């Protein structure tokens, strides 16, 4: 699965480059709080933080590596949907940092219907 992610990302971004399109930002996955490409990259609910996050991190690494290979200066976004849960965000990015993921921007979704209208999140 890791190689598929790498090749797909590489091929997709190469098409942009071949068309003369510069890409400023790439978001690896979408709302990946619980992982990506379920069930393979789902964050586990057992084991150490390292074990829980391992598959997600390896998938993200491949997408990031392919992006950097085609567009080295492109900003990488990791996007979660838990902006109303500070502890979850802190845990998630502490895990991402344990794996030394190469990202530039933290993206967070905010849904007032579920997270309330208190903007002091």
Question: What are these model-predicted stretches?
Answer:
Residues 1-28, 52-66, 93-99:
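An active-site-proximal structural segment forming one wall of the substrate-binding cleft
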Residues 11-49, 77-79:
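Active-site groove signature of glycoside hydrolases
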Residues 54, 65, 69-75, 86-121:
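Glycoside hydrolase catalytic-domain groove-lining segments
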Residues 82-83:
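Cytoplasmic membrane-interface segments at the C-terminal ends of transmembrane helices
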């Amino acid at each position: 699965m890791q190689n598929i992610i790498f090749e797909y990302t590489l091929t997709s971004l190469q098409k942009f480059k071949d068309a003369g399109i510069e890409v400023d930002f790439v978001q690896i996955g979408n709302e990946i709080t619980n992982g990506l490409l379920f069930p393979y990259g789902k964050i586990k609910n057992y084991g150490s933080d390292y074990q829980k996050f391992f598959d997600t991190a390896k998938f993200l690494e491949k997408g990031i590596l392919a992006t950097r290979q085609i567009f080295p200066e492109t900003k990488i976004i990791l996007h979660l949907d838990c902006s109303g849960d500070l502890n979850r965000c802190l845990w998630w990015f502490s895990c991402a940092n344990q794996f030394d993921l190469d990202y530039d921007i933290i993206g967070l979704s905010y849904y007032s219907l579920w997270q309330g209208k208190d903007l002091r999140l």
